[in-house]
């Protein structure tokens, strides 16, 4: 039986990046790197914030373990690069990533195939905040449509047009 090192080849753990979730990615990536190395897998790190993309492209990796979060990591960008350079990678593909990073688009897709989703609406600076409160109620959760984890999440109890605008 082939060793894991030979079976998996050279693995690049793509972590860090430039999103608001950089620190989470670095912690997750460090855990992945340690687990791979503990399993005697030939693994090394690539961080797009501190390394040039040419370094990733020019090295002869056999596969990539993607552990980037948020913009640039879960939005189809790094997945598109992996497909362009023909490097197999973990996680969702370009299309699924591009759709799922956008909560508004994801909700529309889910609704279109009959998956129940909570009531909600897209809020912009031009939105009628009083009308949104009338439709959804005074206890609201507000979240950016394209951030991951709980970045930018606000819980508003007894919302007013002003508190909703601030969020």
Give names to the regions the model predicted.
Residues 1-95, 99-108, 112, 122-132:
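ATP-binding N-terminal substructure of ATP-dependent carboxylate-amine bond-forming enzymes
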Residues 4-5, 132-135, 144-148:
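Solvent-exposed alpha-helices and their adjacent loops that cap or buttress functional pockets
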Residues 8, 137-139:
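A general structural motif
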Residues 25, 118-120, 139-167:
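Glycine-rich phosphate-binding loop of ATP-grasp-fold ATP-dependent ligases
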Residues 114-116:
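Short secondary-structure junctions
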């Amino acid at each position: 039986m082939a060793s894991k090192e030979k079976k998996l080849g050279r693995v690049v753990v793509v972590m860090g990046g430039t999103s608001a979730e950089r620190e989470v990615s670095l912690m997750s990536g460090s855990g992945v790197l340690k687990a791979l190395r503990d399993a005697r897998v030939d693994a090394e790190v690539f961080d797009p914030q501190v390394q040039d993309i040419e370094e990733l492209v020019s090295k002869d990796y056999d596969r990539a373990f993607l552990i980037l979060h948020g913009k640039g990591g879960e939005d189809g960008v790094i997945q598109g690069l992996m497909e362009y350079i023909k490097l197999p990678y973990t996680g969702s593909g370009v299309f699924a990533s591009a759709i799922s990073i956008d909560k508004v688009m994801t909700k529309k897709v889910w609704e279109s195939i009959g998956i129940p989703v909570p009531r909600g609406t897209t809020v912009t600076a031009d939105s009628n905040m009083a009308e949104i409160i009338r439709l959804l109620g005074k206890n609201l959760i507000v979240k950016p449509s394209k951030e991951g984890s709980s970045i930018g999440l606000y819980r508003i109890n007894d919302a007013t047009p002003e508190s909703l605008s601030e969020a």
